[in-house]
Design a protein with these regions (language model features):
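Short glycine-enriched loop/turn motifs at secondary-structure junctions
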Residues: 1-3, 53-58, 88-89
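Short hydrophobic/aromatic beta-strand element in the GNAT-like acyltransferase core
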Residues: 38, 46, 62, 82, ...
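N-terminal beta-strand motif that seeds the catalytic metal site of vicinal oxygen chelate
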Residues: 1-18, 59-61, 111
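Mid-chain, well-packed structural core segment of small domains
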Residues: 61-86
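Conserved active-site tyrosine of GNAT-family acetyltransferases
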Residues: 17-22, 75, 102
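Vicinal oxygen chelate
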Residues: 78-112
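Short secondary-structure junctions
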Residues: 25-32, 82-86
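Conserved short beta-strand elements that form part of the metal-binding/catalytic scaffold
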Residues: 27-59, 104-110
Length: 112
């Protein structure tokens, strides 16, 4: 069975939020319309950012990657610092970022 993931993050003002997401994830894969763009993280695995003011700030997405340090180092190099770093009892690590609307985007990785 093939699996595709399309997670959506809601923001108050897409045009105001877009520069942060470009800095965070790079250029988007495509614009769905004037107030929504899609970032493809891997084949069939995407994050969409859409203007929905009534739901802004309530999204939480965690993406598990094999190369957590590489992902986080790239984001930090582009000028965005994580808001939290955690290591769970089983060694799994999670690094959390928050966009200007308060949405949580986390990256998890395997134990070192």
């Amino acid at each position: 069975m093939a699996l595709a993931l399309f997670a959506e993050i809601h923001v108050r003002d897409f045009q105001a939020a877009k520069p942060w997401y470009v800095q965070f994830l790079g250029e988007s894969a495509f614009a769905a319309h004037d107030t929504e763009e899609v970032w493809e993280l891997a084949e069939n695995r995407s994050i969409a950012v859409e203007e929905q003011p009534e739901n802004a700030g309530h999204s939480a997405v965690t993406v598990f990657v094999d190369d957590l340090d590489t992902w986080v180092d790239g984001i930090v190099a582009r000028g965005i610092e994580p808001t939290k770093r955690e290591t769970y009892d089983n060694g799994v690590r999670k690094v959390t970022f928050h966009d200007p609307d308060g949405n949580e985007i986390g990256f998890g990785g395997p134990p070192l």
